[in-house]
């Protein structure tokens, strides 16, 4: 798993022939196709909300509260907090580098985190998760970059990626 913020380096190095990136500029020798926007929401468990945030998204409490990051390169939590309160988290950080385990850690109250809308919207509606800042999602624009060469296999992969994106992402 590579974060879309870091996949362009894999294309540049030649380690991959195609990748989902958050970079709209084509890597030399590649073509770029806009896929859509992945929407994320800052969430926490109801228990975490009461224990660390006094039941409200107070900027000072949120900044100091424990955070769950995917890994050390994960910038989504920082990006959310900079946009919402103007600074980055200063509380303890937990790293959980597996998607389902990451969401599970947030649900168990290890900290607050930014989860994809597809993974948290039902849980927000059911009350299993609390959205910390309704109306303040983190949107990440995604692009498909692939080497500019003729390859029936790469063409089929590209078609599948674009079809999946059209079905699951917000339009650019």
Task: Give names to the regions the model predicted.
Residues 2-6, 27, 53, 97, ...:
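Short, conserved clusters of charged catalytic residues that mark active-site
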Residues 5, 26, 120-121, 139:
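Positions that flank functional sites
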Residues 17-21, 111-115, 132:
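Paired acidic/hydrophobic, glycine-rich loop segments that form the ligand-binding mouth/hinge
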Residues 31-110, 119-138, 167-172:
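C-terminal regulatory
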């Amino acid at each position: 798993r590579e974060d879309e913020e870091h996949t362009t380096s894999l294309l540049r190095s030649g380690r991959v022939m195609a990748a989902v990136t958050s970079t709209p500029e084509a890597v030399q020798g590649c073509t770029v196709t806009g896929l859509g926007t992945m929407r994320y929401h800052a969430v926490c468990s109801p228990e975490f909300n009461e224990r660390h945030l006094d039941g409200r998204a107070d900027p000072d409490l949120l900044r100091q509260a424990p955070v769950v990051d995917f890994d050390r390169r994960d910038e989504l939590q920082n990006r959310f907090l900079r946009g919402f309160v103007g600074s980055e988290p200063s509380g303890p950080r937990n790293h959980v580098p597996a998607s389902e385990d990451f969401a599970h850690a947030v649900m168990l109250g290890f900290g607050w985190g930014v989860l994809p809308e597809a993974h948290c919207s039902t849980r927000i509606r059911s009350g299993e998760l609390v959205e910390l800042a309704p109306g303040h999602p983190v949107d990440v624009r995604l692009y498909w970059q692939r080497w500019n060469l003729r390859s029936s296999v790469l063409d089929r992969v590209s078609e599948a990626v674009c079809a999946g994106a059209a079905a699951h992402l917000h339009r650019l």
